[in-house]
Amino acid sequence: MTVITIAKRGLPKLTTSTSSTTTASSSSTITSVASSSSSLPLLSNSTSSSIIPSITPPSRNGNPYILDSGDMPNGTVFIVVGGIAGVIFLAILLWWVITTYSSHRLTRSVQDYESKMFSAQHTQFYGDSPYMDYPAKENFQDQVHISESDISPGNKDESVKDALVSHTNNEKPFLSNFERPLSSLVSESNRNSLFISPTGDILYKTRLSKLYQESPRLLQKPVIMTSDNVSTNSLVSTISSSSASSLDNGNEKEVGEDIRKPAKIASSPSRKLLNSPESDGSVNRNHSKGNLLVVQSKRKPTPSTYLEHMLEGKEQDE
């Protein structure tokens, strides 16, 4: 390989020469100096050539430090790194799909369970209240109420058997206190809404806790015999039976005061009359005459009366 090098052009040089001439005369001496300058450009060109050898890599034969990549395609490293990154991305995507699907199934199952639990057939509620879809008095209106004192020990087992048989044979089973539906405070439509009523939630939890606390007592309530021979256990039956027996004994005023003042129930004369043998005999005589049908009031009870009825039922249980 030949390399041509061009040298710089030479700069012009300045040459200065000085000559002096002296002439002597009698009058004066004149000295003249003549200067002359001459400059010629000097141009010089030089060429040089050199040979540079090409680089030859060492042979791979017998050299352990050189990777033999003859069988591998170009960009092998990029292909390996991209494959690893793709596998990681696909694993994350698959995990996300599985998690989303399982969460969706769990949410649907919980939603279906809650919709069934909050439906009218599975909602548990205690007693009569203005928050119910229909008042509890409709279930106990025009029915025959029999108190515990009116039922002899021998007839209790038979009445329980009759109640079980009538419950299984009846096409439309009666609704117990644990099966009364709530109103629209907690319904399926509200559960599907984003709005949640704190008051309704608190009321529901409070009533549910009362249900769990009062469930042993409700199982020991007296039997109610309806006109269709359907028997139920209810807190309202205890209240109505005590009211009916007190009405038969001519104690309407005392019972009304006892209902409004639950603290005086234990010492009320109507309670003593109910527990006395004379009152039992009079009640039996009145029932034998056909005065077993008690029609409850059409007026809807207030919340305070509802709570007082609950307290009265507890006192009568004890």
From Swiss-Prot:
Q: Which residues carry this modification: Phosphoserine?
A: 129, 279, 282, 288
- This protein's superkingdom? Eukaryota
Spans annotated as Disordered: 238-318
Q: Which residues cross the membrane?
A: 78-98
Ranges of biased composition (kind: Basic and acidic residues): 250-261, 309-318
**Glycyl lysine isopeptide (Lys-Gly) (interchain with G-Cter in ubiquitin) cross-link, renumbered residues:** 314
The record's section on InterPro entries has: PRM
Alphabetical UniProt keywords: Isopeptide bond, Membrane, Phosphoprotein, Transmembrane, Transmembrane helix, Ubl conjugation
Q: Point to the regions of Low complexity compositional bias.
A: 238-247
The annotated topology with respect to the bilayer is: Single-pass membrane protein
* Ranges of compositional bias, category Polar residues: 276-285
Q: What GO cellular component entries does it have?
A: cellular bud neck; fungal-type vacuole; membrane
Compartment(s) of residence:
Membrane
Q: Which family does it belong to?
A: Belongs to the PRM5 family.
Name of the protein in question: Pheromone-regulated membrane protein 5
Kindly list the organism's lineage: Eukaryota, Fungi, Dikarya, Ascomycota, Saccharomycotina
